[in-house]
Swiss-Prot record:
GO terms for cellular component: cytoplasm. Its main location: cytoplasm. InterPro entries: Lysidine-tRNA-synth_C, Rossmann-like_a/b/a_fold, TilS/TtcA_N, tRNA_Ile_lys_synt, tRNA_Ile_lys_synt_N. The N-terminal region contains the highly conserved SGGXDS motif, predicted to be a P-loop motif involved in ATP binding. PANTHER family: TRNA(ILE)-LYSIDINE SYNTHASE-RELATED. Its EC number is 6.3.4.19. This is tRNA(Ile)-lysidine synthase. NCBIfam families: lysidine_TilS_C, lysidine_TilS_N. It is found in: Cytoplasm. Keywords: ATP-binding, Cytoplasm, Ligase, Nucleotide-binding, tRNA processing.
Amino acid sequence: MQLNSNGWHVDDHIVVAVSTGIDSMCLLYQLLNDYKDSYRKLTCLHVNHGVRSASIEEARFLEVYCERHHIDLHIKKLDLSHSLDRNNSIQNEARIKRYEWFDEMMNVLEADVLLTAHHLDDQLETIMYRIFNGKSTRNKLGFDELSKRKGYQIYRPLLAVSKKEIKQFQERYHIPYFEDESNKDNKYVRNDIRNRIIPAIDENNQLKASHLLKLKQWHDEQYDILQYSAKQFIQEFVKFDEQSKYLEVSRQAFNNLPNSLKMVVLDCLLSKYYELFNISAKTYEEWFKQFSSKKAQFSINLTDKWIIQIAYGKLIIMAKNNGDTYFRVQTIEKPGNYIFNKYRLEIHSNLPKCLFPLTVRTRQSGDTFKLNGRDGYKKVNRLFIDCKVQQWVRDQMPIVLDKQQRIIAVGDLYQQQTIKQWIIISKNGDE
């Protein structure tokens, strides 16, 4: 059984994820024998999921095995009781926690490469699983031999080796291992694919499950093209405000994209601020209909902390505004520089004293101001509409009233002509 050892170097500290199953034990055996000179140091990681009664015996077996072969071993016991109590599927949660621990240990060990025992049959199973459960359009279709994590790489040296070859290798060298009895239970989708569907395909002389590898190659090339196109679009059309955790994109430019590229763009943008966003394709398609509608302003709640705000020609992803964090009313007794929400107010000393105290507040229903240079009044709400001011900006913009409670300034949109040079309002941070 030949490993693909191109993923590490002779001076690397390699770490092997060992479950005690036949695949990982055969991988470990090869690393200790035929490939013992291909690395500088070898360490084992083992996760005890604490779900099966055999887990304790497996962990103890691996401790003895590693001690006999002078291998450093680290074991982690996961607590999955919360998912079990709620009858949730533990597979995804276990995988997340497992890789969180791998990340932690690779950093602690200052290791270079993590090896896993995924093999050819795992690859075919994963391809089929992603096709049938609808997760093929926004993911690669299977495993890559090499993938990158924070500070290290994951390599899969058995990815071209079939399960049949692994079994033959184990029988030849009498390699000890444990069989997970749950792998035979077809109530789990992956087991059903592995134990029933793939063998049925292989029994038909006109069909070959291995042809899925060609589909994977084609699919992954298209996936990479989409990823590149999304990055190009983001670079050209998206503006970021890192401090405020705010980004905006041209609504028209976004609407002109094909739906497949829209999904990739949003996946990239949402993951920038919140890694656990998991928006379904169906939800995305509903959003796209709203984005392309004629409605000028509306919002979509992502979580309790994040929102998508549509404002005229802009699509904005931003943190939700917590009303308690913004000024609603402020009194100014004398000239000076003041901050109101995200605006800076410069009140000049030449402003007539009879106008003080000034009241600075956010908008209220029915607000009007006197037009400059002509008779009549205009509603503040109409001014916002004419200037295409986003809804959330309207809620923060300072409106300045004089002692008589007459509006003399509306943010950076309007100042009464007679006092224009003495009240200067600008967005905080603008030059």
